[in-house]
Structure formats: structure tokens, C-alpha cells
Swiss-Prot record:
Disulfide bonds: 35-38, 94-122
Family annotation (Pfam families): DsbB
Record organism: Cupriavidus pinatubonensis (strain JMP 134 / LMG 1197) (Cupriavidus necator (strain JMP 134))
Family note: Belongs to the DsbB family.
Entry superkingdom: Bacteria
Name of encoding gene: dsbB
Protein name from the UniProt record: Disulfide bond formation protein B
């Protein structure tokens, strides 16, 4: 069980970081400029990945890290749902996103601007990836990863009862 749970969390971390890597590929190779909501979704994926790695390292507090990973996922899902809704109804956006100043003022945007600096519009029409928008894919993956963490936590709690 120990090796299985390590592999489980490592896989979640690998997928999470891989998706951030894919976002960077889209940014640097395909010219997709990240908007503030995109950056916030990156934070969610990074949170899921980091908390999953901590669950591998700190076995005694694994449920805590798993729960924080789920919380990161739920926050990311909320942002992705809002982002998809903006894409479906672009008139709901005023074109100027006040969130951009806040995201760009975060220390991460100063330290790693290539990854965390936002200079795109949330309603900018970008080419789809395999038929879906990037925020839609983000929503799907955030849901899958969060659900996977939740199911693992529920199964773990049942085993301790």
C-alpha cells in the first residue's frame, strides 16, 4: 500500500506539473498569452502538484496535504468555470481586467515573470486544442485531479475505520 500511495501522489504531481509545462509550451511556442485567470489556474495546478509531493514526503500528515491539494483544485475549478463562462459570453467582460494588476503585483510575477506575468485578455479568442478551449481543458483536468484526490482521501479514511 505504501508504494501504491507514493505512486498515486507522484502521478498526480507529474500530471499537474506536466499541464503547467503544456501551458508554457502554448505560451512560448504557440503564442498564447496568459490572462489573469490563466495564471490563477496555473497556481491551482502547481498547488495540486506541490501538495501531492508533500503527501509523498510527509506521510504522517498525508491527509492534510491531500486536503490542501483538493482545496487548490476546488479554487482552480471555480476560476476555470468563470473563465469558460466568460468565453461563452464575451459581452460579460468589460475588456479591462482589474485582476491583471493584482496578479502581476504578486511576488511570483516579479520572480518568474515568464511563467506568472499576465498580459493576455480573458476573452481573447485563441485556437482550440483538440476541439476545446484551453480553459475548458483546464477545467476538465482540475476536476479529474481534484476528484482523484477526493476519492483517495475517502478510501484512505475508510481504511482507518
Amino acid at each position: 500500500m505504501q508504494a501504491n500511495s507514493r505512486a498515486y501522489f507522484l502521478l498526480i504531481a507529474f500530471i499537474s506539473f506536466g499541464l503547467v509545462g503544456f501551458a508554457l509550451y502554448l505560451q512560448f511556442e504557440k503564442g498564447y498569452q496568459p490572462c489573469p485567470l490563466c495564471i490563477m489556474q496555473r497556481f491551482a495546478f502547481i498547488g495540486i502538484g506541490l501538495f501531492s509531493l508533500l503527501a509523498v514526503i510527509a506521510q504522517n500528515t498525508r491527509s492534510l496535504w491531500q486536503g490542501l491539494g483538493m482545496l487548490s483544485g476546488v479554487g482552480g475549478i471555480a476560476v476555470a468555470v468563470y473563465h469558460v463562462s466568460l468565453l461563452l459570453n464575451p459581452k460579460a467582460s468589460c475588456g479591462i481586467d482589474p485582476l491583471e494588476n493584482w496578479v502581476n503585483a504578486l511576488p511570483t510575477a516579479k520572480v518568474l515573470p515568464q511563467v506568472f506575468y499576465s498580459d493576455g485578455l480573458c476573452t481573447a479568442p485563441l485556437p482550440p486544442v483538440l476541439g476545446l478551449s484551453v480553459p475548458a481543458w483546464s477545467l476538465i483536468w482540475l476536476f479529474i485531479l481534484t476528484l482523484t484526490l477526493a476519492v483517495g482521501l475517502i478510501r484512505r479514511e475508510k481504511n482507518f475505520r
